[in-house]
């Protein structure tokens, strides 16, 4: 099951996150009752405060770990001002998969290992958090051949012991 992306709308004071919780909490419970797991993919808006709390913290509190997991996106955590490794640790046990996406100067997506995210820490925390899948995701290759970018990301991961 999926729900399209919605961004943080400061004009609405984050009201749509309240709406999301109200609408999707029963959905998450129904999925759980039927042996499925509801997943949430973050962007940068979840690292803004709404009513004095980061949205991602509120989501983690409102949905129990057995109701909703997170597909943490390392790039968007960093764009939002967070530390991806720290958030992997905070959401431990709720991250069956994470999106590996590197961050380059100027808010650009980069090949894994060529930006400024400390992936050695990310890998360490992901292992401790019980993450089973780390998925390379580079939405924008900034004019480069996407297959070349994928190969360089793959080579970086292999250099860190992943096959």
Which residues does each predicted region cover?
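Active-site acidic/histidine proton-transfer and metal-coordination neighborhood
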Residues: 1-69, 147-148
